[in-house]
Amino acid sequence: MDYSLTVLLPKTDFPMKANLPQREPHWIEVWEKEKVYSTLLEKRKNCPQFILHDGPPFANGKAHMGSGLNKILKDIVLKSRNMLGFQCPYIPGWDCHGLPIEHKVMSEYPALAADPLSIRNKCKEYARYWIEIQKEQFRRLGILGSWDNPYITMDPGYEAAELRLFAELVEKKWVYRGLRPVFWSVGCRTALAEAEIEYQKKEDIAIYVEFPVGEEELKKAGLPQGTSFLAWTTTPWTLPANLALAVSPDLSYELRQVGGKKFIVAGKLAESIPGFSHSVVLLSFPSGQNLEGLKYNHPLLPREGVVYTADFVSGETGSGIVHIAPGHGMEDYQLGMVHGLEVYSPVDDQGRFTKQCGIEKIVGLSVFEANSILCAMLKEKGLLWAKYPYVHDYPFCWRSKTPIIFRSVPQWFIAIEAFKSLALKEIERVNWIPSRGENRIKGAVESRKDWCISRQRYWGVPIPAFYKKSGEAILDPSIIRRFADKVEEEGTDLWFRLESKELCQLLGLAPSEDLVKGLDTLDVWIDSGSSHYSVLKPRGEDPADLYLEGSDQHRGWFQSSLLLSVASKGKAPYKSVLTHGFVVDLDGKKLSKSSGARDLSEQIQTYGADLLRLWVASEEYAEDVPFSKEIFSRLSDSYRLIRNSLRILLGNLHDFNPQEQSLPDDRLREIDRYFELCVNKLVKKTKAFYENYEFSQVYQALTRFCSVELSSFYIDILKDRLYCDGQNWLSRRSAQTVLYRTFECLVKLLAPILPFTTEEAWRASGKTSSIHLELFPEEREIKEEEKLLKRWEKILQLRDLANRELEKARKQKMIGKNLEAKLILFTDDFEAEDTALLTEVFLVSQLEIIRSSKTEILVEKALGKKCPRCWKFSLFAQSNSDPQYPHVCPRCLKVLKGLPESFLVSD
């Protein structure tokens, strides 16, 4: 007889092969058809809210793996918070204005350069196109949210709210217009924010320049003829704008003779200056303060400058003397403000010298082209002491990839310095994950100067300012609010469409030939940074519970949002901030769109969204996250383990109706009650990991449970009961009761990470509604839990000992499989009544307990004959001469003859 036909093998429609790229789209359609997102919001309407505010990605090109990492992390947070009993509305957003899009449009349509409205229309089309592409990519990841109603920074409603926030800042006197140095992109011809700067290695010319002391000053100070200040600079092109020299009040200075020349330099730096190794000290000055007020002659132009002290002068490099050009450096500017120096910047928006520079040879040249000419002029005058190549970190424009310059032009600023201390206090009130994020953003804010918010571009929200012919600016909160009301109806194109007179009339200003509308637009960091005001505030969700972005956003969105929120309402816009690293290759190099990063859609098509999500969950997201085929090969093994665990559970529940056939706790077998403790432990720690955003710990806990507790331990032990006991025996239903509870717990705990796989398994179990509407499982109360745990601690120790002894017997060829063995257990911890339990747990055919104070296990060959149905050895099987079922064991004979479980057949 073929006894294999009589055992109850697992059956399930849940396939072993996942085919994720092919199967996953079906579930997206199901979620759409069943309106799972809106149903979930309704189901949790009486629950506390948890608001994760989406940082808007830029609507420019396909989403890359870094974007995928970010969105998956957010969705894991939201799904887990939903299952923890929160209502979690998710409003995705897109950032649309700014240089990258305008730069792209201008390169494709150069003929539109003089037509602002046409440029803006093309920019809108471009942004809308990529929003739809990215939206589908993100939805394909299994992310639930308000995809049909996202927030988009170029929408009129959003722009209007942004302008109303701007009006508040103007009203609070945080906004001013000033002439001061700003980061200037020559490639894009606009001012840039600090967050739009990328530092790269750049080779420049470093020079030591002589600034001769004037004749009158020599006499006043008692200095010898031919004395010069020797200054070091890596930007020779700024020399035409030199108006002062700076020395340190904390350094001592010396007058040194080198050959026929005499130089004033910092004493501690003298020996490091080229050619100074044999210099002679003529005079000493205890402090830079002894030099303050001295005048010098400009090395290239017929004018004088004055020496001032400044704390920023370093004693680490150079000569201890810094040349000051207030129009081309922030520290220079600030020193100039103290001493009433002109903010002088003879450079146009293309980075070329104007006639104002006073040096005919360099007029019309770019500042970098002028370097060599200026050096040649200095050399010709005998005022170039040394020149050499110098490699340093230099700021570049993030979009044009060209080196930026500091240039002074009239711009609009937010007075960060005025409320910086409050912003720093708010940083301390926020929960930063990981904690090092606090110091990172603190450092960024502490060093932050006033924020240049005006841009000389068309594609952005216009600054609704008017200018008189005299240059006086009119920026009035009431006018801004009126304009915002109009923008809500018509959009910001209105500003570019109407003439100045029409705008004046529309906004309640008396039309005048003297008033001209401004053409500057707001920095795009104002766009995204005002999202707490534009999106959260109207929904009553401000402050958000969580902002979650890459670590670069300490300089970007986290900071702009913080500063605008503190400026408008005195508080941070978020309670917690979580940051993740960059996606990198195996060499640790960052992947990004512009450098040809792997396309997100391509990876979804290769691996499936669930495997990408498992990758995100498995990594320590706070660090840079490696991405490679090797990593995904290992992850595939983990995924197969999880999927196979779900399949085993489903397969062994094919004939189980939990509503009708579940057993109460007091009728469960002891091992089943113990395994419920294991499941309880998993539930408790996994929920805690989710709450604390420790997703790699979730991954490790769940994969370990599937591999060790479930597959290697529990399922291995249960197979005999599940396959060979009678279908409706209580022993089998006890196992199935706990397997069902295990399935429900495991599939729910996996759901935030593997939404597609768990949905498929959930529906395969007979459920008709989405798993994503469920809550996480609660821990079950288990009778005499501590006593049970202590007892099973001993059982598992014995199991380890038994396995070691069985392995020895196997190596000695005494046995093959465990079922060929009989164990003699010497112990005083267990009684004869535990024999059946320990036999089952140790996976042997027979076991005998002998009372002994010394714990020991002996292995013998099992007695009797192997049952052809269950493969256990039995004396009964040896003597069983049943005409229909000869040589089967007592248990199998009862099953085959349809006898009740309680019927006694003696072995």
Curated annotation (Swiss-Prot):
L-isoleucyl-5'-AMP binds at E549. GO terms for molecular function: aminoacyl-tRNA deacylase activity; ATP binding; isoleucine-tRNA ligase activity; tRNA binding; zinc ion binding. One of its GO terms (biological process) is isoleucyl-tRNA aminoacylation. It catalyses: tRNA(Ile) + L-isoleucine + ATP = L-isoleucyl-tRNA(Ile) + AMP + diphosphate. Keywords: Aminoacyl-tRNA synthetase, ATP-binding, Cytoplasm, Ligase, Metal-binding, Nucleotide-binding, Protein biosynthesis, Zinc. Its EC number is 6.1.1.5. GO terms for cellular component: cytosol. It is found in: Cytoplasm. Binds 1 zinc ion per subunit. Zn(2+) binds at C867, C870, C889, C892. A motif ('HIGH' region) lies at residues 57-67. CDD domains: Anticodon_Ia_Ile_BEm (cd07960), IleRS_core (cd00818). A motif ('KMSKS' region) lies at residues 590-594. InterPro entries: aa-tRNA-synth_Ia (IPR002300), Anticodon_Ile_BEm (IPR033708), Ile-tRNA-ligase (IPR002301), Ile-tRNA-ligase_type1 (IPR023585), Ile-tRNA_ligase (IPR050081), M/V/L/I-tRNA-synth_anticd-bd (IPR013155), Rossmann-like_a/b/a_fold (IPR014729), tRNAsynth_Ia_anticodon-bd (IPR009080). ATP binds at K593. Transmembrane segments: none annotated. Its main location: cytoplasm. Its cofactor is Zn(2+). Belongs to the class-I aminoacyl-tRNA synthetase family. IleS type 1 subfamily. Catalyzes the attachment of isoleucine to tRNA(Ile). As IleRS can inadvertently accommodate and process structurally similar amino acids such as valine, to avoid such errors it has two additional distinct tRNA(Ile)-dependent editing activities. One activity is designated as 'pretransfer' editing and involves the hydrolysis of activated Val-AMP. The other activity is designated 'posttransfer' editing and involves deacylation of mischarged Val-tRNA(Ile). IleRS has two distinct active sites: one for aminoacylation and one for editing. The misactivated valine is translocated from the active site to the editing site, which sterically excludes the correctly activated isoleucine. The single editing site contains two valyl binding pockets, one specific for each substrate (Val-AMP or Val-tRNA(Ile)). Monomer. This is Isoleucine--tRNA ligase. It comes from Methylacidiphilum infernorum (isolate V4) (Methylokorus infernorum (strain V4)). The lineage of its organism: Bacteria, Pseudomonadati, Verrucomicrobiota, Methylacidiphilae, Methylacidiphilales. The gene is ileS.
